[in-house]
Design a protein with these regions (language model features):
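Hydrophobic alpha-helical transmembrane segments of membrane transport/permease proteins
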Residues: 15-64, 158-172
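Generic alpha-helical transmembrane segments of integral inner-membrane proteins
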Residues: 9, 13-26, 101, 105-109, ...
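Hydrophobic alpha-helical segments of integral membrane proteins
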Residues: 9, 45, 49, 59-75, ...
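Membrane-water interface at transmembrane helix exits
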Residues: 23, 27, 31, 118-119, ...
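Generic hydrophobic transmembrane alpha-helix motif, especially the helices
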Residues: 131-183
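Alpha-helical transmembrane segments of integral membrane proteins
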Residues: 2-3, 90-126, 142, 165-256
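An internal, D/E-rich "acidic patch" concept
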Residues: 56-112
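A short, hydrophobic C-terminal helix/tail in secreted or cell-surface proteins
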Residues: 257-261
């Protein structure tokens, strides 16, 4: 087991290095840069800036310096604000983490409940309604849902105030972020629950006269949650990456996104 974990960790580190190298070198192939000639900057000023940010050095050397600074906690300085990027992220990550954490909890709780209901009412009205809405949830991107929620509930109906730094409202961003993982967990729970209910140990428990609720919650649901637990990791990654887009639509300048100007 320890050898397997070490192997997986080493592969993860290797993957990160490969992805970072590819991203770095591809970005350097793109024409232009932060101090290109399109800006009203003299050649002397451009040269000073390039020396300051090590852009005058060969690209392989730039990458080595970049990784060395990164490993030492130096993430560089933001060209927009002039402040340290690590400080900027730590200051603004709280809002993104709060939205993502609440969205993940909501998605898991509601998804498991709806999936269980759909499994227990298979081919009946509740099951069909749940299948319909989960299909919408998996088909609609989070940024589209965030835009629709903002237009309907904030601008058209005026039921919910638009996000501001003085009056934050987490409801719509949380709904938009939780919609897809909640729908996926619902379908995952339903499939796992139906499979668990058809197992021999469930039939044995029923034959022994075990109460129906005990069979469902103690035996069937406990085993049906195993696939849901394995999905938590990818779900958190999805929510954190999607939160930047959703926040850019729903939230003001206090979120963890770069300025659009």
């Amino acid at each position: 087991m320890s050898k397997y974990l070490v192997k997986r960790v080493l592969l993860a580190i290797l993957s990160i290095l490969i992805v970072s190298a590819i991203t770095f070198f591809v970005m350097n192939l793109i024409p232009g840069g932060p101090f290109n000639k399109e800006k009203a900057t003299s050649k002397e000023a451009q040269q000073v800036l390039e020396e300051r940010y090590n852009l005058d050095k060969p690209v392989p050397e730039q990458y080595v310096l970049y990784m060395n600074n990164l490993l030492h906690g130096d993430w560089g300085v933001s060209l927009h604000s002039g402040r340290n990027i690590g400080t900027e992220i730590s200051r603004k990550f709280a809002v993104s983490a709060k939205l993502g954490g609440v969205a993940a909890i909501v998605a898991i709780i509601i998804g498991v409940i709806l999936g269980s209901i759909a499994a227990l009412t298979r081919n009946k009205l509740p099951d069909r309604l749940i299948v319909f809405f989960t299909t919408l949830g998996t088909a609609m991107p989070s940024f589209v849902l965030a835009t629709l929620l903002l237009l309907v509930f904030c601008l058209k109906l005026g039921w919910i105030p638009v996000w501001s730094s003085s009056n934050p409202n987490y409801l719509l961003p949380i709904i938009a972020l939780a919609a897809y993982p909640m729908a996926y967990i619902t379908r995952l729970t339903k499939t796992s629950m139906l499979d668990a209910l058809n197992q021999d140990y469930i039939r044995t428990a029923r034959a022994k006269g075990v109460h129906r609720l005990k069979v469902i919650f103690k035996h069937a649901l406990k085993n049906a949650l195993i696939p849901v637990v394995t999905y938590v990791g990818p779900m958190v990654a999805y929510i954190l990456t999607g939160s930047m887009v959703v926040e850019n639509i729903s939230v003001s300048y206090t979120h963890l996104t770069l300025p659009t100007t």
